Amino acid sequence: KNARQVFAIETGENGLLFFQDNTPAYIIRRFDIARDGTKIKQEDFASLLGKTSLTHGGSFKYTGSYEDIATCIKRYVAAWQAEMAKFFKLVVFNYLFCNSDAHLKNFSLQQTPDGDYRLSPAYDLLNASLHVKDSDFALEEGLSPNLVKSDVYSRTGHPCKEDFETFGKLIGLNEVQVQKALHSFTGSDEQVKQLISNSYLDERSKRMYLRTYEERVSRFNRKN
């Protein structure tokens, strides 16, 4: 809900329904099936990067960096800058909302009716800290092994806004694109809090969700 309603990130259409015994069920419309029932070609980035359990071990989907995904986008997407801006925004979102399970198989390219490729709608967006011990990033090499870290990152071990600015430019975005994406995350705290408050999470999970989000925002905005 936060991704789609607050930050205008394209996601699969989804909803929550309840059975007669009040057991909840999360449903999502498949976005790899066209309205006429035909299959839409889609590949995740583990496949596009040639990574499997045979080539990279059991944790293959957690290997590499987000720069690897960006490089792959440039390789397969003709209008890559527009899709790169979407990808960059999604990386920032995952960091702010503690989605430390944003691995290679949770990003995909999808073929359009014209035969070219675009990022698929975002999926598996969750606050992983509610379920497991959290880390900043799912991928072992983080944003990029080539990232020149800010003083804050070097000192604290956690990236801040300056590091995402550097990463955005590293993957080929210009200053305007980077700042537009980052600006979209400012001034939305009240909307986020309201959505968390109105969610079907239990009260303990709501408090934890809000606390972890506020901690990430604080890290993100840290300058010293």
For each of these PLM feature ranges, what is it?
Residues 1-104, 108-224:
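Anionic ligand-binding catalytic core segments
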